[in-house]
């Protein structure tokens, strides 16, 4: 059985103490300019601030030169799909959004502000973001339930001239594709030939499937299942997002679909993939069991029946964590630096390949220190780079 990570466990009380120690919360705003004299104050506010105001009024692009817009991202949620906890409301999502904001700063030196919108109406959310969106260089949507997340993101992309990125969809897809690229390399398999089974048909699963197809996996080689079974053409009550991934097949269950599969991607619920199912997979199976907090199958259960498997999860206490933190800060960093108006499929694929390539490099000392002294090397237990790898 493969070993677990050396990352220390923590209790709920320790997490609460972390958020409550010193100043409450995790973020604060600091001045980037001197603010120690009366002259500094006059330049920063009245009357000096009138000069950049006039310039921006004449040329809105000047906001990139005279304000923090070009390095500022709004992290936005309505709390309708918080982590694995569900719909707990806008305010309850604030610790997550603050956490997202600090990750932007820590890993890509991007300033981010969390904004929680207390509404379940996608049109209200769209209208709100449209009104303040131009104050930011980019919009990161987070923890918004499907199908509203699709509707909101698409409309904002059409309306705003800055990048809009739903990380639960695209961050997951980019990181998963990076892991898949390396897993296929280690397994000597071609992306054009593999058979893939996806459990879950929510935002993350649909985004992963979309990116897999753009990357070269044929449509008919991917079988997707929701809580009612396989998405097949002719099945009743499929929305437009699920219908796009329905295929002609007589397969109806996970047990049938997994037979001979090269790849299993789980973004669904715990314990739905059994040892017997894993036994039926192809040689050198690739298993991404990413349900949180508990995976579709535990890695040790996989290794009990298959010593040729490559396994990834969404957890930090196992190797190969599918963690969006290795993606979204740097994707936004690149987009902001070139003043991109959108984050397109080509950019996502390029990011996935860059992340995959990073895992093949030697692990530097600072990464080993952050991982409790471990120095992983590219292979079955290190297909996705550490969060702390610069």
Question: Where do the language-model regions lie?
Answer:
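Glycine-rich phosphate/diphosphate-binding loop of Rossmann-like nucleotide-binding domains
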Residues: 83, 88-108, 160, 166, ...
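Generic secondary-structure signature for well-ordered alpha-helical cores
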Residues: 46, 50, 61, 102-109, ...
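Adenosine-phosphate binding glycine-rich loop
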Residues: 167-168, 187-189, 291-390
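N-terminal ligand-binding/catalytic initiation module
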Residues: 2-164, 358
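Short, ordered loop/turn segments at secondary-structure junctions
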Residues: 78-80, 88, 117-118, 143-149, ...
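Rossmann-like adenosine-cofactor binding region
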Residues: 243-310, 315-317
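General beta-strand structural signal in soluble alpha/beta enzymes
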Residues: 114, 140-143, 164-167, 198, ...
